[in-house]
C-alpha cells in the first residue's frame, strides 16, 4: 500500500470512533472536520462527537438491544463508550452523559493521539482512490452530498423526512389480521388489519387529538416539505385517510374471516396494512404511518388497530430531516462501497439510526479500513451479535422500502430451538449468546 495514511471525513460519533480504531492499529489518520470553519444549524460547539439532541445513549440493560450493542462496543475498546462511561450522569436504567464533558474528553483524546492529524476544513470532493471513511452525518454539506450523489450514479443518497413504526411479528394477534395483497396482485405480501366504521371513527378521533413531539428549529422547514405525517392526514379529513394509507379497496375479507364487520359488507370500512420489514420476516412496518407523535402517544393510538392491541414496537415512527444512502445496493457489511472497496461510509448516512448505532458503524468501518490498509481481509461480525446484525440489516433489507433502523432484537439472528416465551428470558439468552459468539470471533 503506497498510501501512508487513511482519511476520515467528519468528526461526529462515527468519524471519531473510526479515526480512533484506525489509529490504535498503528495507522496514521487525517481527520477532517468542517466545524470551526463552517457551522451547522444543529451543533452548538466545535467539539467532536457532539450530542445534538438528547444526552442519552438509551437503555443499559442487556435485555435491551442497545444495551447489548454498547457492551459489545466496550469489549471492542470504543472511544465513545469509554468516554461516555467516564462522564455518566444519573438516568435510572439508561446511560446518559454530561454532553459537554463527554464531547470535550473525546476531542481531547483525539487531538492528543500521535497518529491522528486533525484538519479543520470542509471537504467538497471524495478523495480519489485513497482509503477513506466518510462519516459526515445526516446533514452532509450540499457540495459533498452532490459528489456522493454522483458516486452513486445519481441514486442512493436520499433525503428522508419520515419513518413508520415497526412491530415485532410475534406480538401481532394473527387471529384478527389476514394475509393479502391489494386486488390479489402477486403473492400475498401484506398483513391486513381491518376496521369497522365504529373502530375507524374512534381511531380517527384518537389520532387527531394525540400529542405531537416538538420539532427542533432546524427541522421545521424540512418537516413541512416532506412526507405527510399520518396525524396531519387525519386532521385534513376522514377521506384523506380512506383514500390514502387506509384505503380498503381490493382488500376484501377472506371467506374464513370471523372478526367484527359492518353487516354483510365484503370489504372493511378501512384497512391498516403491515409490510414485512426484514428478510427473516420477524418485523413488520405500518405502511404509510410516518408520524411525529410522541412515542407514548404512538403506542396508545396505534394499539387501537385490530391485531396490534399488544404489539411490541421495536421502532417508533420518527419525523426529521436526514440523509441516507441506499445501503442495500451500495454497501457491503464491512461498510465499504461495492464499487470502490477503498471507500467506506459510516454513521447515520448509512441508514443506522441513533447515537450508539452511529458510533458502532464507525467502529466497524474503522476496523475494516485499517485491515484494508494492511492488506488483510475485512471482517464481518456474526449476525448473532448486535454489532453484526445492524450492518447485515442495512445491507440486506429490501432496498425499495429501506429506511433508517435502530438496533433491536428483531434484527439479531433468532435463537435455535424452541422459542422462549418469556421476553426477558429470551432477550437474556440472545445477549448471552451474542457475547459468547463475539468472544469466540475475536479470539479466532
From Swiss-Prot:
Reaction(s) this enzyme catalyzes, per UniProt: uridine(54) in tRNA + (6R)-5,10-methylene-5,6,7,8-tetrahydrofolate + NADH + H(+) = 5-methyluridine(54) in tRNA + (6S)-5,6,7,8-tetrahydrofolate + NAD(+); uridine(54) in tRNA + (6R)-5,10-methylene-5,6,7,8-tetrahydrofolate + NADPH + H(+) = 5-methyluridine(54) in tRNA + (6S)-5,6,7,8-tetrahydrofolate + NADP(+)
One GO term of the biological process aspect: tRNA methylation
Cofactors (names): FAD
InterPro entries referenced in this protein's UniProt entry, alphabetically: FAD/NAD-bd_sf, MnmG-rel, MnmG-rel_CS, MnmG_N, TrmFO
Enzyme class: transferase
Disulfide bonds: none
Localisation: Cytoplasm
Binding site for FAD: 10-15
GO cellular component, one term: cytosol
Stored PROSITE patterns: GIDA_2
Annotated SUPFAM superfamilies: FAD/NAD(P)-binding domain
GO molecular function, one term: flavin adenine dinucleotide binding
Alphabetic keyword roster: Cytoplasm, FAD, Flavoprotein, Methyltransferase, NAD, NADP, Transferase, tRNA processing
tRNA processing listed as a keyword: yes
NCBIfam families: gid_trmFO (TIGR00137), PRK05335.1 (NF003739)
Its job: Catalyzes the folate-dependent formation of 5-methyl-uridine at position 54 (M-5-U54) in all tRNAs.
Family statement: Belongs to the MnmG family. TrmFO subfamily.
The protein's name: Methylenetetrahydrofolate--tRNA-(uracil-5-)-methyltransferase TrmFO
Organism from which the protein derives: Streptococcus agalactiae serotype III (strain NEM316)
